[in-house]
Regions:
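Active-site region of the double-stranded beta-helix
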Residues: 10-25, 29-33, 48-221, 229-253
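N-terminal amphipathic/basic-hydrophobic helices that include classical n-h-c signal peptides
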Residues: 1-10
């Protein structure tokens, strides 16, 4: 894995300041033992940097984005019980004479949220200053392009069924608690064109079995998942807000 060598050669615990907020391991150890190989759970007390992640995105910031920033699709998705809802259910026009037709309607969004839907704020590395800065620093340390989404889930709800991503993921738990069930890959190191939907039956069958890891993330905890690892996540008895940082893989394909 090329990144492992890059991390070992270029990074130390002093220079990898963004990475040290997401993994409780020295860069060389992370590169050799976990990157692209195995999940890594890091509890809040083990991580460097500020306590928690509310400096990057807080519940109040989510409220501001939804209600005061004129957010448009595709910067918001809404999902419930494994299904992504049509944008027409929560968007509308920008007012008389305006050509905008996809502006987020916060009252409709909150109606769906109250009915158990998960709100997915997408592309925050482009629109929210603290995450613009953090993503730029982490991307420079990893030497990889990345993206940042946020997931706000009501108590006891699950937005997506078991699936895998075709990019590596850092999960940063901001608020509330969320239970993650993680299973080994059905396809090792999937490429971007090898999305989980093409193996839906195999993914579902594997997801119904005993997980390789079953953990509850609390505020300030972080979880690293290599691409291809199956996962599902369910909010516990309070709402859950977490950040997902997706790191794209650079391959010859």
């Amino acid at each position: 894995i090329q990144l492992a060598g890059n991390l070992i050669h270029f990074m130390t615990s002093e220079t990898a300041t963004a990475l040290s907020r997401a993994v409780a391991a020295e860069p060389a150890k992370f590169a050799e033992a976990f990157w692209g190989r195995a999940p890594l759970l890091s509890r809040a007390g083990e991580l460097a940097g500020p306590a928690g992640f509310t400096d990057l995105l807080s519940p109040a910031a989510v409220d501001e984005l939804l209600s005061r920033r004129g957010l448009r699709t595709p910067f918001l998705r809404v999902a419930r019980q494994g299904t992504v809802l049509p944008a027409s259910q929560f968007t509308g026009g920008g007012g008389a004479g305006a050509e905008i037709t996809d502006q987020v309607l916060d009252d409709q969004v909150m109606r769906l949220y109250a009915d158990g839907a998960t709100l997915v704020l997408q592309g925050l590395h482009r629109i929210w200053p603290p995450l613009i800065d953090y993503a730029r620093q982490l991307g420079a340390e990893l030497r990889r392009p990345l993206q940042v989404n946020a997931y706000l889930t009501p108590p006891g709800s699950q937005g997506f069924s078991t699936h895998y991503d075709t990019h590596d993921v850092f999960v940063l738990q901001v608020d509330g608690t969320k239970r993650w069930r993680i299973h080994a890959p059905v396809l090792a190191d999937p490429l971007e064109k090898q999305a989980w939907g093409g193996r839906a039956d195999e993914v579902a069958a594997t997801g119904a079995g005993e997980p390789a890891m079953d953990v509850v993330l609390a505020p300030g905890d972080a979880l690293y998942l290599p691409r291809g690892w199956l996962h599902s996540a369910e909010a516990q008895d309070t709402r859950s807000l977490h950040l997902t940082i997706g790191v794209r893989s650079l391959t010859r394909y």
